[in-house]
Amino acid sequence: MNLISKKNELKQGFYPLFFLEEFYIRVLIHMNHDHILKIGNIKQSKLIHVNRICHYLLIKRLIRQIRKQSHKYNGISEFPNYETEFYFQYKNRFYNLMIENVFLLILQTIWQHQKTRKNDPCILIHQSIQSAFPFLEKKIIHCIWIIHGNIQLFHTNQQFNFLFLLLYERIRDKSFLNLLKNIFNLKKELLIEGFYCDKFHLIELSMFLRNFYINEFDSFIVYHIVKTWKLAYLLNPSQAIDDFSFIQKNDILLNIKRKQKRLPLLCWLANKSFYSLYGNIHYVRRDLSFLMAIQAGKHISRFWKYNCIKFLQLKLGFPCSLDVLYLKSVFNQDFLFLGYRIVNKLWKKNFKIRAVSWYSPIIFFFKGRRISTKMPVFNLIHRLSVMHLCNLEGYPIHKAAWSVFNDKQIMNIFSNLLRNILLYYSGCSNRSDLGKIQYILEFSCMKTLAFKHKSSIRSTWTQYKKHVSFLSLVKNRHKNGKTSVDLYFLFQKTNKLWLLDLSKIQDSLACFLFID
């Protein structure tokens, strides 16, 4: 019993270095240095908000998974794309990268301790470096290289192993430290300050955590919906997947071992029966917010009761609760979500919308709501006015900040902006109002070019109309325009019940397909 209790004590050892939330606040503020307008006036509310993002439960889960598995470090490379399973397939590789990134962030904090600057947000508490490494006080003589940032002086294996001996005194996890040794033995240049400072902008712990959990949640949703529609999926995999499209549909189609069976009649019967039992689940996510629209069937509650809610509680550690005061204040008014208007209007069909914000551990249940198929034109014009592309009345103006670019870059910026808007709102019932947005972007582009060359709009139009001709939507009905957008979707018949299909457009996610 003593051996077992001692073993459990080692497994449940406290990791003060990784649970130190002040350390993660410092790291995250340093990574978001460019996004902070007033560095000296960091409010306490912002620190609390950052603290919620980098919650220690994520690191606790990381450590728990490290102890359960045996990891093999295969060098710094991209995720393998030859695996067949899509459900948590990058799990082992993720934890290897996490260990590397966490340790490098620790080293970076040490190196910058002696380089304090005025109003440096990276250092909120000016204390000794022992605040990050409390166990170094016992071996301070042997850790002079670490304190002065001269870790590159570890020329011998004895000095290199001594660093991990100090870590082991506090962490007491052999598998964790062995993995660290393998990482730095294969890439010892990671211990050099110059190399690390050059690569630091590529290593963002919070963004890496956030993207992984988003992909993990997407995989979880897809996995259980495919499991729910198992019969229809086995009969006709391609049609079953196309009936509910998700963020990683292309990856799913490549990774799943599909059984090639062509039984169209049975597939049609299976789809009809399963839709009547489980309903339709439409999943939309952009950045850290996601939305699920459900046309509930007879047994749709099983999916939520035993899958999604359990996943949020056990995997992410988020308590599933209701904010009654927030619901009462929001229920009687319309609001925008992901660029679409959520209308407070009772619908005949049993249609529910559930929205979750990753910044707050609350799930909101909205009953009797529906997604409006009309594009919020005035809100979109307001956003364009914030970007200084037009005024509040929708009159186009020039963008002086973009006049420093060359002509090709200016045209590409406006072309990509119009392309993204067309794709995102292509299924709206008032898609004819897209002509207003097209007009604003077209003349704003011309005015920007005229402002750059100090010429009139007429002469600028004559010179650049071959390159920046945003043709009318009517002329582009059956063919692509200069913006390389398939405008066929703009003229499809608007359905009463539609599905938002997601596609990656540059760095953002856009919904561009609406099907029944």
UniProtKB/Swiss-Prot annotation:
InterPro entries, alphabetized: Domain_X, Maturase_MatK, Maturase_MatK_N
Domain of life of the source: Eukaryota
GO molecular function terms noted in the UniProt entry: RNA binding
Predominant subcellular localization, coarse grouping: plastid
Alphabetical GO biological process terms: mRNA processing; RNA splicing; tRNA processing
One Gene Ontology cellular component: chloroplast
Keyword terms: Chloroplast, mRNA processing, Plastid, RNA-binding, tRNA processing
Keyword Chloroplast set for record: yes
Localization per Swiss-Prot or TrEMBL: Plastid, Chloroplast
PANTHER family: MATURASE K
Function in brief: Usually encoded in the trnK tRNA gene intron. Probably assists in splicing its own and other chloroplast group II introns.
Family recorded in the similarity comment: Belongs to the intron maturase 2 family. MatK subfamily.
Protein name according to UniProt: Maturase K
